[in-house]
Amino acid sequence: MSTDSNTMFLKIEFGGGLELLFSNQRSHRITIPSTVPADNNTSVTTKDAASPATRPADVTYLLHHLRDHLLKEREELFMENGTVRPGILVLINDTDWELEGEGEYLLKDGDEIVLISTLHGG
């Protein structure tokens, strides 16, 4: 868990072949800011007088962060229209994200997010 209130620690797990897009690594431990730009911009910016609007970090921001910082190839197999592609199951602390508000779920320090592809070639 993070000791800094400006950041949060998350455990990310990939399965069902989705890990192949993320350096073939199933488990990641990441730290993200607790407060993020309202436009989901994940690039590091310096604070200035005209700082952008911010909001608490949610799963939508996390998906953009994963795409911009951990995804190694084939973005189109991970995200579509600002969210995960159909066929990717998202669990938040072992609960289907549809029951948690999907992308609007506000992340908490120590959350575990699991993403599993349910689509397989044949």
Swiss-Prot record:
Q: What does this protein do?
A: Acts as a sulfur carrier required for 2-thiolation of mcm(5)S(2)U at tRNA wobble positions of cytosolic tRNA(Lys), tRNA(Glu) and tRNA(Gln). Serves as sulfur donor in tRNA 2-thiolation reaction by being thiocarboxylated (-COSH) at its C-terminus by the MOCS3 homolog UBA4. The sulfur is then transferred to tRNA to form 2-thiolation of mcm(5)S(2)U. Prior mcm(5) tRNA modification by the elongator complex is required for 2-thiolation. Also acts as a ubiquitin-like protein (UBL) that is covalently conjugated via an isopeptide bond to lysine residues of target proteins such as AHP1.
- Crosslink Glycyl lysine isopeptide (Gly-Lys) (interchain with K-? in acceptor proteins): position given as 122
Q: Which Pfam families match?
A: Urm1
* Recorded superkingdom: Eukaryota
**Family annotation (HAMAP family):** Urm1 (MF_03048)
Q: Which CDD domains match?
A: Ubl_Urm1 (cd01764)
What is this protein's name?
A: Ubiquitin-related modifier 1
- Identify the pathway: tRNA modification; 5-methoxycarbonylmethyl-2-thiouridine-tRNA biosynthesis
Leader peptide range in chain numbering? none
Instruction: State where composition is biased (Polar residues).
Output: 33-48
Annotated region (Disordered) at 33-52
Keywords attached to this entry: Cytoplasm, Isopeptide bond, tRNA processing, Ubl conjugation pathway
Q: What would be one Gene Ontology cellular-component term for the protein? A: cytosol
Q: Which family does it belong to?
A: Belongs to the URM1 family.
Cellular localization per UniProt: Cytoplasm
> Any idea which residues bear 1-thioglycine here?
122
Q: Which GO terms describe its biological process?
A: protein urmylation; tRNA thio-modification; tRNA wobble uridine modification
Extract the InterPro entries matched here: Beta-grasp_dom_sf, Mopterin_synth/thiamin_S_b, Urm1
* Originating species: Laccaria bicolor (strain S238N-H82 / ATCC MYA-4686) (Bicoloured deceiver)
Q: How is it modified after translation?
A: C-terminal thiocarboxylation occurs in 2 steps, it is first acyl-adenylated (-COAMP) via the hesA/moeB/thiF part of UBA4, then thiocarboxylated (-COSH) via the rhodanese domain of UBA4.
